[in-house]
C-alpha cells in the first residue's frame, strides 16, 4: 500500500485531535483550548488540499465561509434566527461580537455533511440539502446541549 496525501492528511488530523483531546483534559486546558482557531484552520487547509473538483465549485468555499460568518453576526447581535447566544474566547478574535473563524467552521461542517450525503445516491439536490441541514441541526443540538451542561445551564 502506498502512502498518499489522503493518508498523510488523516494521520495529521488524527495526531492533532488526539493531542488536543489529551491537552484539553489536562491541567493546561486553557492553552489547548486557545488553539481551537488553529485547529479549524488546519482542518480547512487539509480539506482544501484534498478537494478535487476545483473547476466547478471553487467560488462556493469563500462564499460559504462568508455567509456563515454573516449569519452568525446577525444571530449574535439580534438573537435571530437562533435565539440569544454569544461566543467566548475559545474561538479567538471577534468581529461584531462574533468569532472570525466561525465562518470556517460552517464551511467545514457543510462540506462534511454534504460529503456524507453523496453515497446515499439521492438525485435531488434539495433532498440532499435537507438531509445535510438535518445533520447540522442535530450536531448543533449536541453541541448546544453539551455547552449548557458545561456552563451549568438547563
Question: Where do the language-model regions lie?
Answer:
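Aromatic-rich, lipid-facing transmembrane alpha helices and their immediate juxtamembrane interface loops
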Residues: 1-154
Amino acid at each position: 500500500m502506498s502512502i498518499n496525501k489522503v493518508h498523510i492528511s488523516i494521520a495529521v488530523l488524527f495526531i492533532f485531535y488526539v493531542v488536543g483531546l489529551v491537552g484539553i483534559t489536562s491541567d493546561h486546558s486553557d492553552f489547548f483550548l486557545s488553539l481551537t482557531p488553529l485547529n479549524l484552520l488546519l482542518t480547512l487547509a487539509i480539506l482544501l488540499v484534498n478537494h478535487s473538483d476545483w473547476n466547478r465549485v471553487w467560488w462556493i468555499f469563500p462564499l460559504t465561509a462568508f455567509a456563515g460568518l454573516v449569519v452568525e453576526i446577525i444571530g449574535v447581535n439580534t438573537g435571530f434566527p437562533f435565539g440569544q447566544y454569544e461566543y467566548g474566547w475559545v474561538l479567538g478574535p471577534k468581529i461584531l461580537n462574533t468569532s472570525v473563524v466561525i465562518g470556517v467552521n460552517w464551511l467545514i461542517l457543510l462540506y462534511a455533511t454534504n460529503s456524507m450525503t453523496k453515497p446515499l445516491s439521492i438525485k435531488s439536490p434539495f433532498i440532499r440539502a435537507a438531509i445535510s441541514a438535518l445533520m447540522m441541526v442535530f450536531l448543533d443540538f449536541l453541541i448546544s446541549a453539551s455547552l449548557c451542561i458545561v456552563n451549568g445551564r438547563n
